[in-house]
Amino acid sequence: MIEISCASIQSVGKGNAKLIEFQYKREKENILISLKTDSTQIGTFHRIATIIYALKMDIISGELSTVIEQGNEYTIDSFILQADGGDTTKVAFQLGMMMDSVFSKNAKFEEILEKLQIQEPAVATFFKETPEFIFSDLPEKNRTCLYLESSAGRGLLYYVSRILMQNQINILSATIETDMETGRAKDSFYLTDGSGQMFASTDLALKIRREILAPIQSNSR
């Protein structure tokens, strides 16, 4: 069942239960959205970033978190989005409806991707000006922090989150920031590997860095 008002979408399934709470409002020329879902598996943020990118929006700031309420685990995210022209209210509503489809228990993400016909972002432009990738383990929290600083642009988080997902990296929380004066993205991701362990000092961190930077490395040959 889906309940829709001018500012929120809520979907609660039966049997194979699913929960999606989506709210949005205009914030000057931007859109502020919040999302709560019981989908917490690896790749959850990539699904969100994919839909945002497909609708020609860019995440300029945001917070990602994983919480436990009454013994159940939830993903709670909030973002400020910059829309690429058009009717921002209409785009935000469309975003909410697509989120419901993406997180449906019966949805196949690959089929949704085919329908969206997403074009790859110009990845090389993100990393041409001294990108920073700093992996550091936080033993007291049993997680790895990835600090990423690069040129900002639509599709950056879609691209980075896809590589993290492909390497079975779980995003437990994150802070997304854009310095509007310098045009630099300054993002911090708190991660574990597929086994729930830290990995900053392992070959996996080097592999992720290498894969993220692959487009500019191939262009330099």
What positions do the PLM features span?
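Regulatory modules associated with amino-acid/nitrogen control
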Residues: 1-221
